[in-house]
Amino acid sequence: MSKAFQESEIRFNNLSEEALEFFVEHGYVVLDSVFGVEEMDESNQVLEEMRKRYAGDMGLDLESYDERICQWRDMWMTEPQFDELLRDNRLIQAAQFFMRQPSIQLIHDHVIRKPFSALNSTIPWHQDYPFWPVDTPDALSTWTPMEDVTTSGGCLEVVDKSHKWGVSPPVDFIMDPMDFSERKDVIRIPVKKGSMVVLHSLTWHRTNPNEDKGTNRPAHISLWVPSFARYRPDLSDWHPVNDHITVEAGEHLNVDKFPRFGEFDESNAPSPNSDELHTGPLKLESTMDMFSATPRIAGHIHRIIGDNQRGLPVRKLVDYANDEEVRRVVFERSLEKGIISEDQEKWLEGIFERMLINSTAYLRHRARNVYNDAYAQWWFHVGVKWVELWDNLE
């Protein structure tokens, strides 16, 4: 039986012209053994200790935490081991080399785990650049696994040469997953721990579930732009990196939260790019999207419990999810309207529990469930029915 995908077999051992030509042509490149096995084991150990610490801070055991949380942002800001990794010349020089820029700037970094026995699903097809509030798509990301990753272990998949297609609006992981299953140019990239995949910011990519028993598939991802990139909040005003930006639109990113590497000559920087590079995410009042899921669900609950009629402001989702009386009222009123059945009480309680854990983890540690499953289940089984009911009353 033939595979439904191609497997990437081309590897490079150094920053060569051949490697650069491959990246320019295909939109990705694999560098073998950039970091040592012991270095990756140390980073993985730091990640485990951090997870235990965060779980304890939230009153959870590690198993329960791992069933709910799988992504941690801004690792370089909180963990010295990852700050050291991010500033390592092997990583910096690779990013500079493939971007063909002497000076580069970090957008953000994060770690994503896909443990076989816990939180483990598909991260849908997407390009990276449309999520970033900057004015140039000529950028890249690095993907470094801390364990060996096989073709069945949640490795990266790319659409070969798709960086040449141009910029698309940001993909909504909840409502609008892209489908490239019929394409013959989808390539899976198995890699050893410490190797590095470099992706152009316009290359379409995803990861499938990890099907390899006994593995966790932790990977460190860093995302980079040229230092001449300028702030464009109109392109991505919803992304969490905006929390760290202190400059005005059209200015270069502040270096305290977006560290710069390599000498930057601002006098030679190109003028601000005001082109409409993409139209931004499609946000509809009648549906759910990942770009505004948290305030949208808070708005649903605000109306379900009648706080809108009492003139009370909308509270944060974490406050609603942590309020037993709110959860009780939502269940009873949803049951009364025929939106859910009596035997779904525990199911709805589970939705609230997951939203509480997700919201708390993000507020405390900038950690989250990258799959948005609790938000999606709320919308498809509860939220959409309430919205239809309200629409019929108006």
Segments and roles (model prediction):
Residues 2-26, 32-125, 130-133:
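Non-heme Fe(II)-dependent double-stranded beta-helix
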Residues 5, 203-204, 208-307, 311-320, ...:
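Non-heme Fe(II)/2-oxoglutarate
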Residues 21, 149-208:
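Double-stranded beta-helix
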Residues 125-127, 172-185, 214-216, 235-240:
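Short, surface-exposed loop/helix-turn segments at secondary-structure junctions
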Residues 133-150, 223-226:
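Short, conserved beta-strand element in jelly-roll/cupin
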Residues 338-342:
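Charged, low-complexity interaction regions
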